[in-house]
């Protein structure tokens, strides 16, 4: 197995550098072939590592950065005026081929702007897309994109997203001929806006896609499709709604379990079942949205991720680097262009 190097934006996120550094050390223990580049405030990073790391010091390096992209920074201003930020540094290492991928929990808009500026999109790709996996009723994963990189998408962009999502499902989830669907307000072909209808025709005409038609929002978790395509506006709302529902259910179970003695007894008896359910829907294991369609690998972690959640984002970056996802997407897009020429 070839050695991999990841660049981490240590200063990104809501919970402080210690969360990311803790996840980083766990990743180094999990992946013997992995090296890491820590981009951020050297004093802060060194101070924490001196207290927690010893045997792994030969597998990471620190690149000092004088700036940090804040969560409320304007993306365009961050792109122009924070070139020495930890986020820009991590992306730069991918651009210079000093790292195979980068991971950041920072400002999504700034990450998108900097990644597009430095890495550029693959030939034949109009816009990159944010994609993440979600659990299904049968214990599988469904890939949903776009999650907000492009608010409005024309039919061509939706077609490209379908191809990119299909490649990701093949390479990361190991699914042969992934079932691809478009998120719509109904399953009938007469429903939906013009760009959705046109995209449906384009997907159906492609030999490179296993297109199954439209699905509705309540079908996302029903294991009907392996890849669901939508524009960034609808995709982001769908994702945030799902995350909010999971949090509501978890909190409701906790609250009900404390209501009275009978509830406590029933909760204790049901604990093995609840634990299995939680492991399946735990948001931590679905942390790590990939910014695909670029000439390099960029993975976006939740800003409020725990160290375990950030570790999942690192795992996603490792998998994509091992399977050379950008190259596979490039090849598939080229085949699509040849098919349509």
UniProtKB/Swiss-Prot annotation:
Sorted UniProt keywords: Cytoplasm, Lipid biosynthesis, Lipid metabolism, Phospholipid biosynthesis, Phospholipid metabolism, Transferase
Gene3D superfamilies: Isopropylmalate Dehydrogenase
Tagged with keyword Lipid metabolism: yes
Pfam families given in the database record: FA_synthesis (PF02504)
Subcellular location: Cytoplasm
Domain of life: Bacteria
Record's GO cellular component terms: cytoplasm
Primary location group: cytoplasm
Pathway: Lipid metabolism; phospholipid metabolism
Known EC number: 2.3.1.274
Similarity comment text for this entry: Belongs to the PlsX family.
Function (record text): Catalyzes the reversible formation of acyl-phosphate (acyl-PO(4)) from acyl-[acyl-carrier-protein] (acyl-ACP). This enzyme utilizes acyl-ACP as fatty acyl donor, but not acyl-CoA.
Official protein name in the record: Phosphate acyltransferase
Organism of derivation: Pseudoalteromonas atlantica (strain T6c / ATCC BAA-1087)
Lineage summary: Bacteria, Pseudomonadati, Pseudomonadota, Gammaproteobacteria, Alteromonadales
């Amino acid at each position: 197995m070839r050695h991999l190097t990841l660049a981490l934006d240590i200063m990104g996120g809501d919970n402080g550098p210690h969360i990311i550094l803790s996840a980083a050390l766990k990743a180094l223990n999990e992946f013997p072939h992995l090296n890491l580049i820590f981009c951020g405030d050297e004093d802060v990073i060194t101070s924490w590592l001196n207290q927690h790391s010893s045997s792994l010091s030969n597998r990471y390096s620190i690149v000092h950065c004088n700036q940090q992209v804040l969560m409320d920074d304007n993306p365009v201003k961050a792109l122009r005026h924070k070139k020495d930020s930890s986020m820009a540094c991590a992306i730069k290492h991918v651009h210079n081929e000093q790292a195979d991928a980068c991971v950041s929990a920072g400002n999504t808009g700034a990450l998108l702007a900097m990644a597009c500026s430095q890495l550029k999109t693959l030939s034949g790709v109009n816009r990159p897309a944010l994609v993440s996996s979600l659990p299904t009723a049968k214990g599988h994963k469904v890939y949903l994109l776009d999650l907000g990189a492009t608010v409005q998408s024309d039919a061509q962009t939706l077609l490209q997203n379908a191809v990119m999502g299909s490649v990701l499902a093949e390479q990361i989830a190991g699914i042969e001929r992934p079932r691809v669907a478009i998120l719509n307000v109904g399953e009938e072909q007469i429903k939906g806006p013009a760009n959705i209808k046109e995209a449906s025709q384009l997907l159906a005409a492609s030999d490179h896609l296993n297109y199954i038609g439209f699905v509705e929002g309540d079908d996302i978790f029903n294991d009907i499709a392996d890849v669901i395509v939508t524009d960034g506006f609808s995709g982001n709302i769908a994702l945030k709604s799902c995350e909010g529902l999971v949090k509501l259910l978890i909190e409701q179970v906790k609250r009900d379990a404390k209501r009275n003695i009978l509830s406590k007894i029933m909760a204790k008896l049901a604990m093995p079942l609840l634990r299995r359910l939680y492991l399946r829907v735990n948001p931590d294991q679905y942390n790590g949205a990939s910014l695909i369609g670029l000439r390099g690998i960029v993975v976006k972690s939740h800003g409020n991720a725990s160290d375990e959640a950030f570790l999942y984002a690192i795992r996603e970056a490792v998998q994509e680097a091992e399977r050379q996802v950008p190259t596979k997407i490039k090849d598939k897009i080229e085949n699509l262009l040849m098919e349509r020429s």
